[in-house]
Every structure is written in structure tokens, then in C-alpha cells.
């Protein structure tokens, strides 16, 4: 019975688990946490009045 021979599918199983446990989380985390927040300054900018050219 060829399905009981672990040689052909065991390597695929091991390498796929290595991919899911080691490589994939690094790639997912780079997409989830790529927007690092920056500290805002304490001084608020003054709002500029709108300049409507047709008035």
C-alpha cells in the first residue's frame, strides 16, 4: 500500500509546517504593523481660512 510509505509525503508535510510556522508569520506581521504612529507636536497648527475664488 503506497499511502503507508511516509517517504514521499513526509518531507512535504514537514516543509509546509516550517513555512507556516516560520516564514509566513514574518510576512504577515510586516503587512499588519507597517504604519508606525508618530508623536504629534504639542503645538496645534492654526487653521487657514478657505480662499474661495468666486466670491
Curated annotation (Swiss-Prot):
A GO BP annotation: proton motive force-driven ATP synthesis
Pfam family, one: ATP-synt_8
Keywords of this entry: ATP synthesis, CF(0), Hydrogen ion transport, Ion transport, Membrane, Mitochondrion, Transmembrane, Transmembrane helix, Transport
Any one cellular-component term (Gene Ontology): mitochondrial membrane
MF terms (GO), sorted A to Z: proton transmembrane transporter activity
Principal subcellular localization: mitochondrion
Annotated compartments: Mitochondrion membrane
SS bond partners: none
InterPro entries attached to this UniProt entry: ATP8_metazoa (IPR001421), ATPase_protein_8 (IPR050635)
Membrane-protein topology: Single-pass membrane protein
Signal peptide residues on this chain, from the entry's feature table: none
Domain of life assignment: Eukaryota
Regions that span the bilayer: 6-26
Family: Belongs to the ATPase protein 8 family.
Function, as annotated: Mitochondrial membrane ATP synthase (F(1)F(0) ATP synthase or Complex V) produces ATP from ADP in the presence of a proton gradient across the membrane which is generated by electron transport complexes of the respiratory chain. F-type ATPases consist of two structural domains, F(1) - containing the extramembraneous catalytic core and F(0) - containing the membrane proton channel, linked together by a central stalk and a peripheral stalk. During catalysis, ATP synthesis in the catalytic domain of F(1) is coupled via a rotary mechanism of the central stalk subunits to proton translocation.
Complexes and interactors: F-type ATPases have 2 components, CF(1) - the catalytic core - and CF(0) - the membrane proton channel.
Listed name of the protein: ATP synthase protein 8
Gene (UniProt): MT-ATP8
Amino acid at each position: 500500500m503506497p499511502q503507508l510509505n511516509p517517504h514521499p509525503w513526509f518531507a512535504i508535510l514537514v516543509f509546509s509546517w516550517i513555512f507556516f510556522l516560520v516564514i509566513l508569520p514574518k510576512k504577515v506581521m510586516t503587512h499588519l504593523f507597517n504604519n508606525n504612529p508618530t508623536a504629534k507636536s504639542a503645538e496645534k497648527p492654526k487653521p487657514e481660512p478657505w480662499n474661495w475664488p468666486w466670491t
